[in-house]
Curated annotation (Swiss-Prot):
It comes from the Bacteria. Keywords: Ribonucleoprotein, Ribosomal protein. Pfam families: Ribosomal_L33 (PF00471). This is Large ribosomal subunit protein bL33B. GO terms for cellular component: cytoplasm; ribonucleoprotein complex; ribosome. It comes from Mycoplasma capricolum subsp. capricolum (strain California kid / ATCC 27343 / NCTC 10154). One of its GO terms (molecular function) is structural constituent of ribosome. One of its GO terms (biological process) is translation. HAMAP family: Ribosomal_bL33 (MF_00294). The gene is rpmG2. Belongs to the bacterial ribosomal protein bL33 family.
Length: 53
């Protein structure tokens, strides 16, 4: 069985701190934390979401 190098990452809204999204992140190619502007249902706006560990 092949071991997976992809890691599950949870994205958290910087304004309301709600955990809205979970994504698969390549552990070998991306060493920095993800920062993506996505829609937050709690804030009802597009806000910056950062990866948690």
């Amino acid at each position: 069985m092949r071991s997976s190098t992809n890691k599950k990452a949870t994205l958290v809204c910087v304004e309301c701190l709600s955990r809205n999204y979970s994504v698969n992140k390549s552990g070998l190619t991306q060493k920095q934390r993800l920062e993506i502007k996505k829609f937050c249902t709690t804030c009802n706006a597009h806000t910056l979401h950062k990866e948690t560990r």
